[in-house]
């Protein structure tokens, strides 16, 4: 029997200390819901999880970017529909005044409406905006030196696409003459020419609207793909990082029992020197 070193107490204390640390770790996992709360819990798992989290955050924002792009196109297409309706009306008036039965006075009255409609085309072009960006003044046309509209549709660098919108002013649509005056229908011949100009303007608008529709559909598919990737990556990160609550509860119960038994054994070990004292008392 020895008294200077109580090895049983030291051993019991060591086991108790490690079990208490394990209980603290398990309780931390249960309180946070995360299996990995620091690099010490699982260094390689944390590294993989952080990479996945980077992609998850990027995918979520890319999805929002794509939806913003869809809103941008919807807004532009709505304004362009108004412009198309106006030019359709100009074309109808041109067909009407191409008929020779109208007097000059009649044509002047129709010209007033045509001029007003041309002015409305310019008003739409000047006031059509999205987040203070002018849509139809050539800012997003091909070859524009002013600016460009980029949609970033992925979680990583350079995963973006450029979108173009042609200039849709009355000048670009050739609804005004070289001197800036609106197209005239003062004679059947001029009115007949206006029909051709209206057709050309409508063709340009229809092509632009078709491009918008195709790009909108593309963005819609992109958004769906991003949502799917976001969901799958989040599931992958969850499997690595999240705690299995049932498993952690079982582990906590086991470790708490070990702590309680370790405490009891430490108390028993601390009583061993008393046996030496009793032996000495018999001398």
From Swiss-Prot:
GO terms for cellular component: periplasmic flagellum. Keywords: Bacterial flagellum, Periplasm. The keyword Metal-binding does not apply. Coiled coil: none annotated. It comes from the Bacteria. InterPro entries: Flagellin, Flagellin_C, Flagellin_C_sub2, Flagellin_N. It holds the Pfam family Flagellin_N. SUPFAM superfamilies: Phase 1 flagellin (SSF64518). GO terms for molecular function: structural molecule activity. Gene3D superfamilies: f41 fragment of flagellin, N-terminal domain (1.20.1330.10), Flagellar export chaperone, C-terminal domain (6.10.10.10). The keyword Protein biosynthesis does not apply. It is found in: Periplasmic flagellum; Periplasm. The flagellum consists of two outer layers around a core that contains several antigenically related polypeptides. PANTHER family: FLAGELLIN. Belongs to the bacterial flagellin family. Component of the core of the flagella. This is Flagellar filament 35 kDa core protein. The gene is flaB.
